[in-house]
Design a protein with these regions (language model features):
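Active-site microenvironments that recognize anionic phosphate/pyrophosphate groups
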Residues: 1-221, 225-228, 304, 319-322, ...
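Helical scaffold of the NTase/Pol beta-like nucleotidyltransferase catalytic core
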Residues: 192-194, 224-251
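Histidine-centered divalent-metal-coordination microenvironment in nucleic-acid enzymes
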Residues: 217-223, 261-277, 363, 367
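Catalytic or ion-translocation cores adjacent to nucleophile or general acid/base/metal-coordination motifs
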Residues: 234, 243-266, 272-333
């Protein structure tokens, strides 16, 4: 029986402060009920061991007794239910966060971030599996991540999810109604999920963390209403309101158009955190002045994408100028630079904005985006082109814009396979999974001598070089004399 694992889980909850000693009997009985057990014999000792090991034992036992199906989705739904029993109620969490915020906003977010890991909402043991490294490029050190923390669904689970009834609740993965939700085959459980109310621009928003943590304290700030993404004056106001309340965090918004936006356009949200991306470190390569806003520092950032950086001690002035630039960009056409505000009534121009505090001043980075497509580039002219799709085909959203590549899990095994062939020989084109990398690998072999000792590191740096090219493709005005001249034409038109 799993009595020891139950006792170990209670011990874990006590050590992490999820429950107190007076909660022990109540929590034990709730766990027994969920596990389908009518009684238990508490062991005399508590073993301090990793949460992953405790939960695995409980899941294996429940599956063996027929309490749950033994597939990844069912196991994730069930262990979240177990952890939800031990997770304090929202009122308790909010009260503790606000108490700490009164002392220091950073103390509050530090506590909440650790809490979200202790509840297993952020599965530390899965995040640790991600492959992460930095790659030196002409634009600074870019961050590369092969995301392995999202569980791979097995074919049976995928089929079951497809056959399951489509519910309209919660409306999406970002809705506040996910807090405490039991989940289903096609929607993750969130009994251990907690969100913190924040007011920005007189609206009710909520702070939470991403369960996949692409970077340190990767947070999501979500609208309390299920409303679509929209970039406008209010967006700039909200971003600056947020960094005013949490000055140790940056925050940004994905663009509001397909191709150049993120994966979720249906729910208005921002992403932020406590991390310094390569784009933030990038210097201003040319200062510019916007007429009527001489009090605002402005310049073009040395970055592969087209970035205007604004800085001022008065956040209201930043909002005014950012709106001015956005309005101008939405209506801007420059045929010589292949920039079209719209074609056939479809708008193409928008902005990816990022806000932060720097040396006591407010700072806004405005990244100019355009989602036009052509026969030659059906996925987008300012999107990674076909020759880069073997590494990155997905949308270039906020996180990538700032210099962090979130790459698909398939690359873990594929890069290992490419390394083997580069070191020991072989024909990549004869392997269905690796054939897509063949042209790239042949080009690399002409420049490097690969050995068992250096292959992994060389490939990592070359993946970084590909990502730098991805960002160059996504840049509207290129880092060439002609591109910078076109960039200045837009700035002078504002």
């Amino acid at each position: 029986m799993c009595y020891q694992a139950i006792e170990d889980l209670l011990g874990y909850a006590l050590r992490t402060g999820l429950i107190e000693e007076c909660d022990r009997t109540w929590a034990a009985n709730r766990l027994l009920q969920t596990l389908g057990l009518e009684s238990w014999e508490p062991p005399q000792t508590v073993r301090e061991r990793p949460l992953e090991d405790i939960l695995r034992e409980l899941l294996d036992n429940a599956a063996a007794r027929g309490v749950i199906q033994n597939d990844t989705t069912s196991r994730d739904l069930f262990d979240t239910e177990l952890m939800g029993i031990l997770t304090p109620r929202p009122a308790q969490v909010i009260s503790e966060f606000r108490r700490r915020y009164q002392t220091d906003p950073k103390e509050a977010t530090d506590w909440f971030y650790l809490f979200c890991q202790d509840t297993d909402y952020i599965r530390r043991y899965r995040v640790a599996r991600d492959r992460k490294w930095k790659a030196a490029t002409p634009y600074g050190e870019l961050d590369i991540t092969i995301n392995l923390s999202k569980p791979e669904k097995d074919p049976k689970a995928i089929a079951a999810a497809k056959a399951a009834p489509q519910r309209g609740y919660p409306k999406c993965l970002l809705c506040r109604e996910n807090e405490g939700y039991a989940g289903r085959l096609n929607h993750p459980a969130r009994q251990n999920h907690r969100i913190i109310p924040v007011t920005i621009h007189q609206e009710d928003w909520f702070l939470q963390y991403s369960p996949y943590v692409y970077y340190n304290e990767h947070c999501i700030v979500l609208n309390g209403r299920h409303a679509p993404m929209k970039i406008d004056r209010a967006t700039f106001r909200k971003l600056l309101d947020f960094v005013k309340q949490f000055p140790h965090y940056f925050v940004g918004s994905n663009a509001d158009l397909p191709i150049v936006g993120g994966s979720i356009l249906s729910h208005d949200h921002f992403q932020g955190g406590c991390y310094t991306f390569a784009m933030e470190k990038a210097p201003v390569e040319r200062e510019v002045v916007f007429r009527g806003f001489e009090d605002v520092e402005a310049g073009i950032v040395k970055w592969p994408m087209s970035v205007i950086r604004l800085r001022c001690g008065d956040d209201r002035r930043l909002v005014e100028l950012a709106e001015h630039i956005l309005t101008a960009w939405r209506g801007y056409t420059d045929e010589a630079a292949f920039v079209f505000a719209e074609t056939d009534g479809e708008p193409h121009n928008t902005i990816t904005p990022i806000a932060r505090m720097r040396a006591g001043q407010f700072e806004l980075d405005l990244v100019l985006r355009n989602n036009i497509t052509t026969e030659e580039y059906p996925l987008g002219v300012y999107h990674p082109h076909q020759e880069l799709h073997h590494i990155k085909k997905e949308n270039i959203g906020l996180i990538e814009v700032m210099g962090l590549a979130v790459l698909p899990a398939r690359l873990k095994d594929e890069l290992d396979g490419v390394a083997q062939v580069l070191v020991h020989g072989g024909d990549l084109r004869r392997d269905e999974a690796l054939a897509k990398h063949a042209d790239w690998a042949e080009e690399l072999k002409s420049r490097h001598v690969f050995t068992a000792e250096n292959a992994e590191e060389l490939l990592r740096q070359e993946v970084g070089a590909v990502f730098a090219t991805v960002l160059e493709h996504a840049g509207v005005f290129k880092c060439t004399p002609e591109g910078r001249e076109a960039f200045l034409r837009f700035i002078h038109s504002v």
